[in-house]
Amino acid sequence: MNKYLLAFIWLPLILFTSGCTSSTQEEQEYGVSSINAEIPIPKKAKEIEVTTTSSNPNIKIGVKYELDNIGGEQGLYRPDGYFNKLNDAGWIELEDKRLGHVQFFEKKDTVIAIEIHQDTFDIHEMNKDAKF
């Protein structure tokens, strides 16, 4: 009798808790950046602005994208899924150059800077002779 009672109590509890846990994270789809076709961009990201001239002499061209919660609250969290996708595409993070919200990546002889905020991110292609 006790076995049936325990099974009656535990079985719904186990089913309820397993139904409330998240399954595998939804796979993100990627397109390409408008400033460099080798830079993957989440397809859900909306291009806001392209900057062709900058007061910063190190920046060749830049683009700003909007994507809900890419950087978490106040942009404090690193979007590891996106950075893993960059790595898969051949971009190597220059960890020693990281500056707060800004991470640098290199592929062949091109360096990009990615600045992460809560709901936006900026990508800047750096000039060949950039000092950063």
Regions flagged by a language model, labelled:
Residues L15-G19:
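C-terminal motif of bacterial Sec signal peptides marking the signal peptidase cleavage site
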Residues V50-F132:
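Extracytoplasmic electrostatic interaction patches
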Residues S23-I70:
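Compositionally biased P/S/T/G-rich terminal and signal peptide-adjacent segments
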Residues M1-L5:
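Positively charged n-region of N-terminal signal peptides that target proteins for export
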